[in-house]
Amino acid sequence: MSPPLQAKLDYVRSQLQEDVTQMLYYARLKSSTKDYQFKDINLNDCLGEVLEDYAPLLEEKQFVIINKLQSETVYTDRRGLQFMLGQIVSNAIKYSSDSPMLTISMIHSEIADVLSVEDNGIGVKKYDLPYIFQKGFTGDSTDSRKKATGIGLYLVKKMADDLNLRLEAASPWEKGFKIVIFFPKLKSNGGK
């Protein structure tokens, strides 16, 4: 099989997989029963699996990945976090620049561990930013957003809410997009 054909098939497979995953998580988030398994999750392992899933597209676009994570762990549901990270990586790919870059880092505060995922893509216009987590919102209808469904970041927000995580986004137009996930620090109950 020729490399261009293989790349096209990888793209189609990835799109189908993402669409099915979104549908399943949409149904899961609407369900009255949840099967989350909260435990300590190694962020590098979790992120590595997500990047592996998107490897063909990341390689095709020649993404530079800057992973500044150490051996970070967070307490959350692994599948939920992987879904969130997958949607964020997918958006970085869809709205990438000519020399795409994805930077992942973490800072620690007294109240939360803060994961930052930042790309250097087209970003979101300032007047659209307050609405990016709303269902169906696709923002400015430029050519790059014509295929947008407005469901990805909505589902990321819903999953974050279910997992008791806080999200923030920043995006100077045409200078990238940054999404920040706040993992609250659990208070010790003194062994009780």
Show which residues each predicted segment covers.
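Short helix-loop "hinge" at the ATP-lid/N-box region of the Bergerat-fold HATPase_c
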Residues: 92-93
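Short beta-strand/loop element within the Bergerat-fold HATPase_c
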Residues: 99-111
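Short conserved segment of the HATPase_c
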Residues: 124-137
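Conserved glycine-rich
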Residues: 165-169
